[in-house]
Amino acid sequence: GSEMCIRDRGMATKIPPHNLGETIDAACALIDNPDIDLAGLMDYMPGPDFPTGGIIMGRSGIRATYATGRGKITVRAKTEIVEAKNGRYKIIVTELPYQVNKARLIEYIADLVKDKRIDGISNIEDHSDRQGMHIEIDVKREASASIVLNNLFNLTQLQTTFGAIMLAIVDGVPKILNLKEMLTEYVNFQQEIIRRRTEFDLKKAKDREHILEGLKIAIDFIDEVISIIRNSKDQATAKVNLMERFGLDDVQAQAIVQMRLGQLTNMERTKIEDEIAALKTKIEEYNAILADEGRQREIIKEEPVSYTHL
């Protein structure tokens, strides 16, 4: 679950945890159909996915949260009433609502029994182990197990309410978002990441291609290049001389003078031409991505698929 304070506004975001695969599926559905409505999104993302389990009571709290950005989601422990060997009944608890502390809950129930604020319980034991949670609540012979359980739901954290607030910072301002708005912000953010990343890759490829074009000239005139370097009093002079003689710029000339003479003479023109050709293909690809928003959104859809199989 995401819980974050936006201090200056005195507001806190409290978003229940969700299944990653379902969330990505809903975001992809929104990319495919920007006009999708709430019911359509909820086909992919039916509700929160609490790691501790529990049972979400009804759909109205989820729907309100997704429709308005605020809602109360009631979660109950997963319980079962079973008949014990002695003819009495036990309430078995195997899952708790999200963020409920088991030890504190058991202690609280014991205090309620001791203070006679709840009737019908003779014993409570924790049999939880690595296999999972297992709390046993013994019901007195004369008591109704279902009434005892209802009282426990009303009086303890066997039933809790998760007050969801889907608050996010949008353009520097805290804003409560409904599900579609939240997913739209996510998609827009991912698109911005793809744009920036592609711009970075494009610049890197262009810079490398530019240096290689300079090296190609050096190979074509290798003897003269080596002679200029050898006859210049230092690197800075060699650089200026190369720039004047071959029309290179500072970056290209720097790349040449930084190489050892042995490296320069061993450079193969075909290797450099192959690398330039590969870079030109990449540059074309990056420019195509940057020019096409639809393409950027398709990349968003392709990339998260790997996360859903974790």
Locations of regions flagged by a protein language model:
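Short, small-residue-biased leader/transition segments that mark boundaries at the very start
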Residues: 1-6
